[in-house]
Swiss-Prot record:
GN (gene name): caiT
Recorded superkingdom: Bacteria
Organism whose genome encodes this protein: Proteus sp. (strain LE138)
Listed GO CC annotations: plasma membrane
Protein name as annotated: L-carnitine/gamma-butyrobetaine antiporter
Keyword set, alphabetical order: Antiport, Cell inner membrane, Cell membrane, Membrane, Transmembrane, Transmembrane helix, Transport
One function term, GO molecular function aspect: (R)-carnitine:4-(trimethylammonio)butanoate antiporter activity
Taxonomic classification: Bacteria, Pseudomonadati, Pseudomonadota, Gammaproteobacteria, Enterobacterales
Topology relative to the membrane: Multi-pass membrane protein
An annotated GO BP: carnitine metabolic process
Physiological role: Catalyzes the exchange of L-carnitine for gamma-butyrobetaine.
TM annotation in the entry: 8-28, 51-71, 92-112, 143-163, 195-215, 231-251, 263-283, 315-335, 347-367, 403-423, 446-466, 475-495
Amino acid sequence: MSKDNKKAGIEPKVFFPPLIIVGILCWLTVRDLDASNEVINAVFSYVTNVWGWAFEWYMVIMFGGWFWLVFGRYAKKRLGDEKPEFSTASWIFMMFASCTSAAVLFWGSIEIYYYISSPPFGMEGYSAPAKEIGLAYSLFHWGPLPWATYSFLSVAFAYFFFVRKMEVIRPSSTLTPLVGEKHVNGLFGTVVDNFYLVALILAMGTSLGLATPLVTECIQYLFGIPHTLQLDAIIISCWILLNAICVAFGLQKGVKIASDVRTYLSFLMLGWVFIVGGASFIVNYFTDSVGTLLMYMPRMLFYTDPIGKGGFPQAWTVFYWAWWVIYAIQMSIFLARISKGRTVRELCLGMVSGLTAGTWLIWTYSGGNTLQLIDQNILNIPQLIDQYGVPRAIIETWAALPLSTATMWGFFILCFIATVTLINACSYTLAMSTCRSMKEGAEPPLLVRIGWSVLVGIIGIILLALGGLKPIQTAIIAGGCPLFFVNIMVTLSFIKDAKVHWKD
C-alpha cells in the first residue's frame, strides 16, 4: 500500500464509536418496539416544546448571515484558485439532487393535507383560510430560509477546504480558529465529530424510512406484490447496490449522471402534473400562496403557540428546522466539494435561487394536485391513511392523474433514482469524514462508502419496523439537538478565521 493510500485509510476514533453507538441504539430499539415508541414520544414532546424557540432563532440569524455574505466584503472572494469543476446547470442539478430525495415527493404530496386539516393560528380545519395558508407554509418550510443556511455553511467549508487548504473534512477540523488546535485534536474534537456522524446516520435512515414505502407501494400498484417489510429490505438493498455502481465511476461520472437524469425526469413529471392537473388553478394557487407567505412570514418565523398550544409549530416548523439542521453539515461538505472555483456570491445566490425554485415547483404542483383531489371529493385522504397508511394515500394522489399506469411508472422511477442520489451524497460525505485525511481532489475509499450505505439501510429498516411518522420525526429532532451547537461553532470559526486570512 502506498503512503498516500495508507494516509487515506479510516480514522478509528471517528469510525468505530458511531458504529458502536448506532449498533446499541438499533439493538435497544428492536429489543422492545413498544417501549421504544414510548421513549420516542417523550423525547419528541420535550425537545419541541422546551427548545423549539432555539431552532427558530437559529434559522432567522443564519438567514441574516446569508445577506451578509451576498452583499458584504467577502461576496467576490473566490473559493479556490481553479475554474469551476462543473457547468452551472449541472452544478445546480447536483445540488438539488443531493439535497433532496424521495422524501421530497413524500412531503410534497401529503404535507398540504396535514396543514389544511389541522391548520395553524387557530384556523378551522378545511376552511378557506386553512387552504390558503396550506401551500404558503410549505413554501416557507422549503424556501429561501433553509437554503440560505445551507449556503452559509457551504461557504464556510469551501473556505476551509479550498482557501485554507485543509485536508481533513470533518466539523472539528474547522474549529481550530475558535477553540485551538489542542482541543480540536483532543477529546473535544472527537466528541464533536462523533455527534455529527451519529446524527447523520440517523438522518439518512429517516430519509430511507420515508422513501422506501413509496417505492414498495408503487410496486404493489404496478405489479400487485404485497407491501411487506421484506420487500422494503429488498428495495433498500437495491439502492445500496446501485450506490456502489455509481461511486465506482467516481464523483464526476456517477453522481453527475444520476443527478442529471433525476432532475430531467423531475421536470417531466412536474410538467405532466401541470398539464393534466389544472394549470390555471396551480398557477393561481401558487401566486396567492406567495402573497400569503409574505403576509404571514413574520408570524411564521417566530410562531411557538405558547398560549393556544395547538402543537402546529412543534409538529412541523421545529421538526423541519431540525431536519435542515441535522443535514446541514453533511450537505454543506458535499456542496462545498462541488462548488470549487465559484465566488461566495455565486454560491449563495445560485444555491438559494436554484434550489428554492426546485422545491417550490414540487410543492406547488404536487400539493396543488392533492388539494384539488380533496376539494373535488375524488379522494378521501383521512380514510386512506387510516386503512392503508400515508404512503398509500400519496400513491393514490398520483394514480388519480390521467394515464395512471404511465404516471405511476414515472413516479416509481423518480422515487428510486432520487434516493440513489441522496445515498450517493451521504455515503460520500460519511466516508470522507471518517478518513484520516483527504487531499484536495481525492476520493474516499469505495468499500468505506458502501459500508456506510449498508449501515444506513439497516437504520431505515428499523424505523420502518417501528411504523408511523413519529419515530422518523423524533430521530430527526434528537439528532438535530447536538448538531445545532456544532453548526453554530463552525459558523463562528469561519467568521473569525476569514477576518484574518480573507482581508480586503
